[in-house]
Amino acid sequence: MKNDQIINGLNEYIGDRYQPCEYPALRQQATEWSESKPLAGIRILDNTPLFTNTLLKYIPLLSGGAELTLAISERTPYDSSLIPVMRSLGIRVIENCNQGDFDCILDCGGSHAHLKPRYGYAELTRSGYYHYKDTELPVILVDDSRIKAIETCLGTGDGFLRAMKQLGHKDFTNRKIIVFGFGKVGCGIVYYAMKEGAEVRIVDEPGTLIPPGTELISRYDSDAIAAAVRQAWCVVTATGIRDAMLQNGAAEEILAGKQLVAAMGIENEWGSSLPEERILNHNIPLNFILEEPTRLRYIDPTMALSNVAALALLSGKIPPGVNRIAPETEKFYMDIVEMKD
């Protein structure tokens, strides 16, 4: 009964912000789990970044019978105005959780790798992998999936572009942008910047395959990096690696110049080499200045995968260490999204 009341409160708060077609995976998950109750009595700690569209992730968990606790970590961006709203609805919220008795932890960025849940963890991000790679408990890396690749590339790239425009930087035409890291996040940023007419240079490993019309700079060539940064309109970091920007020549050029600097990785890539005020959004991923950092249509199946990972952990069939989500599970949710389209 309590979960039903919380769900009603969440639905009332969300109102008509989103159309059902924007979250087919979570909607079907909630419908199915409200009947089967696969999480009845299961204590779940969820550290998905708290924003309005994240509230739709909680509905399937609550529908499934979970005892849900939300984690707020200083390492993970969130909308602080939602904390009192969640508490008023009866959802437990813990800030900087250092202890607790949980069955499953649905984590982001490895913020709760220090806790020991009964069944294991699901981790949303690639950066979180480095916090879990040596764990003796089962971990499902949601990031290691086609669904997450689509969200991270298209959703985060779109978020970068929307955030830049919200800050007034609307004209990319013939502007020089240098992107550090050409993984899933960097790929999306490059895609959207090129669509807007920017001249893009990419810093990554020698031999990295890059799109036509861009230029690759070796991450080991500090002279070339310094020269490119000196000429850049905007410098974007998307390596996902802590301190990745130390001693590569970029910081010195930025301190002497007027380049825009955007961080798009959850880890602190600049370390102590740049003051926070020199980086847009104070070195927090730039898309998190937006009310909707990643559009719901991109993040819906990813959040559904994070939820269903709890069921896989409860099965007891996931071995210790880092694991992929089962291919048939990912296909199930991908098919739901593709049918919507």
Stretch-by-stretch model annotation:
Residues M1-L39, I72-T173:
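Glycine/serine-rich phosphate-binding loop and adjoining beta1-alpha1 elements at the start
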Residues N11-R27, L141-F172, L260-D341:
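Adenosine-phosphate binding glycine-rich loop
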Residues A40-T54, G168-M194, D204:
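Glycine-rich adenosine-cofactor-binding loop
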Residues L50-A66:
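Histidine-anchored nucleotide/phosphate-binding helix
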Residues G64-E67, I91, P117-Y119, T135-L137, ...:
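A short helix->loop->beta-strand "cap" motif at the edges of active sites that frequently abuts
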Residues L68-L82, F180, K195-G213:
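NAD(P)-binding Rossmann-fold cofactor-contacting core
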Residues I91-D101, E205-Q231:
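Short acidic low-complexity segments
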Residues L106-D107, P117-Y130, C234-L280, D300:
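ADP-ribose/adenylate-binding Rossmann-like module
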